[in-house]
Amino acid sequence: MLRTITARRFGPLWSSVTTSKRTMSSGGAAKEPLVLTEEVGSKGVITLNRPKALNAINLDMVRMIYGAMKSWETSKSLVIVKSVGEKAFCAGGDVRAITESGNVDLAKSFFSTEYGLNALIGNYRPTYIAFIDGITMGGGVGLSVHGKYRIATERTMFAMPETAIGLFPDVGGGYFLPRLEGKLGLYLGLTGFRLKGRDVFKAGVATHYVESKNLPALEQQLLATTSSTEVEKVLERFSEKRDAGVEFVLEKQRKQIDQCFGAPTVEEILKRLEKDGSEWAQSTLKLLHKMSPTSLVVTQKQLELGAKMDLKTCLRMEYRLAVHHAIDSDFKEGVRALLIDRDQKPRWQPASLAEVDPARVEKFFGPLPDGSELVFEDDPASPTNKANL
């Protein structure tokens, strides 16, 4: 089958996007595009091509992915998203660039564009399949969990560690985390606990588990399918069964997670963990005490509200949170401590849960100024503050 490889801009709307063709740097070396697109008849393949940065996505990359997906929305039956390299599918969004710039408009542009892509994935007409082979965090989660199929491998490492940098599990985290079994999603969202390999599948984050060595053959067979039923059969043929292999890493803690994280407030969660007293509870307490107290409270409320929302409504809520966080001291401090200086010693303000002001938390969820709310491209009567796509 002829495979036509392209990596292109998508009209004037994408004029700021990295050029699709290979360009020559001043040293004469070819510069690879950060996103590659490939058309195989009625199928499409999108490849993240930033392996040295663990395929972390920046604004240009988000725009390129969105542009490719929109151009294929009515012409393709199936789209595969994967990445270059063995370490990472996508390690997240480039939050360091956002905080270092100090530019709130850049933050708004990035988050609105990224959330617009998340919404598109969640409502995409073609069958969407993400090969989450390697590190999958933050923005990489947003590129995968809202699609119909997510393929984990033995190299997959899933985490939503945003509370450690003074943020919250965004990219629709408020939608998909509370829909995991029991209180597992809240546990993952508050602690940033890392799931690896088969456990990503057993937790329900991935829909299938395939050994990485078999991904090329899986891709080839998927690109040769002619119906959604055939796609299902191919995936089932390659995938392990969910109950196969070793026990889920958190299986023995399921009841404790549901009991402790079923508390109505973060403070009560900590009290239940203290009362539990087990080795797991003690290590979880130690982990939570490292996180931004404000982020913990915001995240608990975010997931509580998101459990009752559709994806787009949840993303609108998260955009409010993101804009408010962009000017908040904890986000800047968390990025500094973990990603810039890397001293691992963030100075949170406030420093304890007891000091978190409920009124301040409510402001994070409050409306933005007129004309500043997130509006998606396909929303009726869209005003001028449409997602910056």
Model-derived features: positions:
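Conserved CoA-thioester-binding segment of acyl-CoA-metabolizing enzymes
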Residues: 2-82, 119, 380, 389
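A structural preference for short, pocket-lining loop segments at secondary-structure junctions
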Residues: 41, 46-49, 64-102, 116-131, ...
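Hydrophobic/aromatic residues within transmembrane alpha-helices
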Residues: 81, 94, 143-144, 199-200, ...
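Glycine-rich beta-to-alpha active-site loop
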Residues: 121-165, 169, 187-197, 208
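Contiguous mid-protein beta-loop-alpha structural module that forms a pocket-lining wall or clamp
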Residues: 172-230
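Amphipathic alpha-helical blocks and their helix-capping loop/short-beta junctions
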Residues: 205-291, 295
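Substrate-recognition/cap regions that form aromatic- and gly/pro-loop-enriched pockets
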Residues: 270-276, 280-320, 326, 330
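C-terminal amphipathic alpha-helical interaction region
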Residues: 321, 329, 333-389
